[in-house]
């Protein structure tokens, strides 16, 4: 099915074939960016950021500008026309005419879905509270595909705050739709992956999962290590935090038993969970990940705008 | 026993667990309709011992979906020409719109009037509904 004119609110709205299509096109644009420099000439991207997220916004803006389009929008709901109290439905009814595609970031969960019910142009969810962030998931998937040449038969470890980590939940749900995946969940017991999500993942594809509190325990078996931030304020007691915070700092010492082709990912920004000494290791791909995020957004928007049918 | 004459045309909500009749009366906003309505409480019942019954005379447009959420023993009798024209068992509704609120404080439905709460029943044995907007589960309690 064509992506032209369609919204993207939840990554699970995309079939595996559609995900593959977006990723393949994203990698094609990454390799030959000059071929795509003008494909969105005359198109306008509207960025409706009800809460600041500079990285996500700049990634979308860069993606549109790299295709020859233009951007307009706001990045702070308080200083914009979308002032407090105005319904999203009304904002969309007006702004819908100003752009050919809208990306919305909102602190309220479900806000982009509401927007999509009133929009005539495609809406992309740029993150809604702790709920969904589909273009981060696409970014993660393209990084996996680029480095592994496939998204299947992989053992993926998620480390850090697995309870509140939106990027982890979104990626995990999507990855569990691919064949023969195994997951390792590394987190403090207070920040374990939610049970309902675990049940859902296990049921979806009969996937194998392991839960542990030790980062190094399964290091030698995993293909991908997805690190996330642990925030101090998530802990109920200081002592527990102090005990665990160091065990989740990835350094070269902890990587000594890891596979040579391990893929180390992080949605960024990182605080201290990956030691800078890891940055120059060939397995560290988190900056490449941020870079690929631009190209996968180019592919997505080009398909939604219908300037490219498929690849 | 207290007798209430049978109605010629209307709706009889029968086999309500004793004590829940008033809640249903309120939830269906029956105090706001103009047709004659009676609420019978603690009527003796062969199967339940005691039950509540609501009789509404005339044709009234009511959303009876929520009855399944309140009490699954309920039977709805649609009366026409003095006879039971249709007998309906109530069920847990699969889709629910607007009847209760999403428990997630970060959900868009809690702040935006255009986002009317909308849920789908999760088949897990509990009366849990998944929010259409934020996907959080809300357990329905009267
Ligand atoms: Zn909700």
From Swiss-Prot, chain A:
Pathway: Pyrimidine metabolism; UMP biosynthesis via de novo pathway; (S)-dihydroorotate from bicarbonate: step 2/3. L-aspartate binds at residues 84, 166, 229. Pfam families: OTCace, OTCace_N. Signal peptide: none annotated. Carbamoyl phosphate binds at residues 55-56, 105, 133, 136, 268-269. Heterododecamer (2C3:3R2) of six catalytic PyrB chains organized as two trimers (C3), and six regulatory PyrI chains organized as three dimers (R2). Belongs to the aspartate/ornithine carbamoyltransferase superfamily. ATCase family. This is Aspartate carbamoyltransferase catalytic subunit. The lineage of its organism: Bacteria, Bacillati, Bacillota, Clostridia, Peptostreptococcales.
């Amino acid at each position: 099915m064509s992506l032209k004119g369609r919204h993207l609110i939840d990554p699970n709205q995309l079939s595996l074939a559609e995900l593959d299509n977006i990723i393949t096109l994203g990698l094609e644009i990454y390799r030959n960016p000059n071929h795509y420099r003008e494909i969105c000439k005359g198109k306008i991207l509207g960025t409706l950021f009800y809460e600041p997220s500079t990285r996500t916004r700049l990634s979308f803006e860069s993606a549109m500008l790299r295709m020859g389009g233009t951007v307009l929008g706001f990045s702070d709901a308080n200083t914009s026309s979308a002032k407090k109290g105005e319904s999203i439905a009304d904002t969309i009814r007006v702004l819908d005419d100003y752009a050919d595609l809208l990306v919305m970031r909102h602190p309220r969960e479900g806000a982009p879905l509401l927007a999509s019910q009133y929009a005539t142009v495609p809406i992309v969810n740029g993150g809604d509270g702790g709920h969904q962030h589909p273009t981060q998931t696409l970014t993660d998937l393209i990084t996996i595909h680029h480095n592994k040449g496939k998204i299947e038969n992989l053992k993926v470890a998620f480390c850090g705050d697995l309870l509140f980590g939106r990027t982890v939940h979104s990626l995990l749900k999507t990855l569990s739709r691919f064949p023969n995946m195994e997951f390792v969940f590394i987190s403090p017991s207070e920040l374990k992956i939610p049970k309902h999500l675990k049940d859902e993942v296990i049921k979806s594809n009969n996937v194998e999962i392991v839960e542990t509190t030790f980062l190094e325990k399964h290091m030698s078996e995993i293909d991908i290590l997805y690190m996330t931030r642990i925030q101090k304020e998530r802990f109920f007691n200081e002592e527990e935090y102090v005990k665990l915070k160091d065990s989740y700092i990835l350094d070269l010492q902890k990587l000594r038993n890891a596979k040579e082709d391990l893929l180390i990912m992080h949605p960024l920004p990182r605080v201290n969970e990956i030691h800078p000494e890891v940055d120059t290791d060939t397995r560290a791909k988190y900056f490449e990940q941020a870079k690929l995020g631009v190209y996968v957004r180019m592919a997505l928007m080009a398909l939604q705008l219908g300037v490219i049918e498929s690849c | 026993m207290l007798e209430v004459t049978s109605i010629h045309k209307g709706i009889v909500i029968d086999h309500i667990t004793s004590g829940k009749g008033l809640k249903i009366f309120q939830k269906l906003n029956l105090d706001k309709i103009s047709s004659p309505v009676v609420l019978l409480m603690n009527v003796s019942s062969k199967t339940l011992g005691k039950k509540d019954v609501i009789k509404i005379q005339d044709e009234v447009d009511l959303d009876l979906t929520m009855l399944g959420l309140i009490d699954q023993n309920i039977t709805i009798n649609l009366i026409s020409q003095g006879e039971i024209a249709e007998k309906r068992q109530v069920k847990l509704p699969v889709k629910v719109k607007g009847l209760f609120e999403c428990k997630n404080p970060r959900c868009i439905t809690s702040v935006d009037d255009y986002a009317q709460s909308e849920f789908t029943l999760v088949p897990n044995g509990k009366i849990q509904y998944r929010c259409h907007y934020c996907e959080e589960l809300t357990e329905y309690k009267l």
